[in-house]
Amino acid sequence: MPAGNQTRTNAKPQIHTGNIPKITPHLWFDKEAKEAAKFYTSIFPNSKITNTTTIHDTPSGDCDVVSFELSGQPFMAISAGPLFKFNESISFMVSCDTQEEIDYYWQKLSAVPEAEQCGWLKDKYGLSWQIVPAIMDEIMKDKDEKKIARVTEAFLKMKKLDIAELKKAYSGAGKR
């Protein structure tokens, strides 16, 4: 992280109890770390911004570092200039129990229609997300290769995943 003078806001003494996650996703933004953290925490339940620090006088100017949680999962974000961009090689998977939940996250997050495919979308910051039904994990573990092939054929044609259509493909309904 760049050296510089620090200003802390919302800072509270942290007592390390050993419950700190081993891995925390860290997102690099040009200038939008605070804005993005507010956006994401407004969408997911059990979410909050836990700390914001501004480091002054860095080579990129002022640098914001934001700690936040999405559905209890810790994240960090940094505003450190336009050196790096998000791409599809990294995405966050959101497991959804209902079609309504899939529809909700899709509507809130999707900002690049041409990037929508097979349950994947891209948000207004360029970050990729996979919005998937929770049942997909069990479906894809099935040992019946014909079922897996039907489900795969179905979801490859979809943008936003449709639970009813995936279940229909899994059961073979409509197939001769």
Indicate where each model-derived feature is located.
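Residues that flank catalytic or metal-binding motifs in active/ligand-binding sites
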Residues: 21, 64, 88
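Core segments of cupin and vicinal oxygen chelate
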Residues: 27-72
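Basic/polar N-terminal segments that are highly enriched at the extreme N-terminus
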Residues: 1-21, 167-176
